């Protein structure tokens, strides 16, 4: 495999969730433009597609040469090899009837478009240029012959994702991703595990336990738990404790 750190090609990127889209460009493993953040408009398919085109055009206008490709992550199961997004996507409800997103962007920009699952790409990135080579380098420096080639990576945030790398290769599974977000919630069988470990889970549990009507983010709730912000410390601690408990159940069912 070529060393991506010495590769001079430019790739436009997108980090998307239900609220915002952050557009950028990478070369040699480094971002080369200031990120551009736009509202995702994930509830409206036409607006969402227009936002994607607008964001990538804004990035392209900052580059000194034509980008080689577009590459980005998307949540949930999909036909990633063909660039088709479909299925019950909690974060992007307007995509549930199926959208040929890869072919659409390829036609708009005239370059290859690579889309994959967010959890898979996180794990793949850590396997190529993150924690896995760092561990192997430490082993080499210590004189050990042991080398690791397998990695399981979990991502937390707007949702809950996982990626699996086996012998240096991404395991896409039968649905183009390895997924855990749809496991049942052990405390509330009417919802899925993602509703117990995501950003909205921490916010919901704290609000339910404390009765605090403020619109707080997990960082605020963490500060309450640490005693740095006014609020119910007991409820804040319990919100994160429940997240940790449910995460453990998802990782080791």
Segments (PLM) and residue ranges:
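Glycine/GP-enriched mid-protein hinge/lid loop-to-helix segment characteristic of carbohydrate kinases
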Residues: 6-10, 22-26, 30-37, 45, ...
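Amphipathic, non-transmembrane alpha-helical scaffold segments
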Residues: 237-244, 248
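N-terminal helix-turn-helix/winged-helix DNA-binding helices
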Residues: 1-8, 14-16
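Phosphate/pyrophosphate-binding loops at sites that engage ATP/ADP/AMP, CoA/4′-phosphopantetheine
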Residues: 52-70, 112-113, 211, 250-253
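N-terminal phosphate-binding loop and adjacent alpha-helix
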Residues: 30-66, 231
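Short glycine-rich anion-binding loops that position phosphate/pyrophosphate groups of nucleotides
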Residues: 75-78, 157-159
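Glycine-rich phosphate-binding loop and adjoining helix at the ATP-binding site
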Residues: 41-50, 66-70, 76-148
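Interdomain hinge and pocket-entrance segments immediately C-terminal to HTH DNA-binding domains
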Residues: 10, 17-19, 80-84
């Amino acid at each position: 495999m070529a060393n991506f750190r010495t590769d001079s090609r430019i790739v436009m990127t997108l980090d998307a969730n239900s609220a915002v889209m952050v557009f950028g460009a990478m070369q040699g493993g480094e971002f080369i433009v200031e990120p551009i953040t736009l509202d995702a408009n994930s509830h409206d398919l036409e607006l969402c597609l227009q936002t994607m085109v607008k964001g990538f055009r804004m990035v392209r206008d900052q580059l000194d040469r034509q980008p080689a490709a577009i590459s980005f992550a998307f949540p949930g199961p999909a036909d990633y090899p063909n660039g088709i997004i479909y299925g019950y996507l909690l974060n992007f409800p307007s995509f549930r009837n199926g959208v040929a997103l890869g072919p659409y962007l390829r036609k708009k920009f005239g370059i290859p478009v690579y889309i994959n699952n967010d959890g898979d790409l996180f794990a793949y990135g850590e396997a190529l240029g993150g924690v896995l080579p760092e561990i192997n380098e430490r082993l080499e420096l210590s004189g050990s012959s042991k080398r690791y080639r397998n990695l399981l990576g979990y991502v937390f945030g707007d949702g809950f994702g996982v990626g699996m790398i086996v012998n240096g290769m991404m395991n896409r599974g039968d649905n183009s991703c390895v997924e855990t977000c749809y496991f049942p919630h052990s405390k509330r069988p009417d919802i899925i595990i993602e509703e117990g470990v995501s950003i909205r889970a921490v916010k919901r549990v704290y609000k339910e336990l404390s009765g605090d009507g403020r619109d707080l983010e997990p960082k605020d709730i963490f500060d309450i738990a640490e005693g740095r912000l006014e609020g119910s410390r007991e409820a804040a601690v319990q919100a994160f404790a429940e997240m940790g408990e449910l995460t453990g159940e998802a990782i080791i069912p």
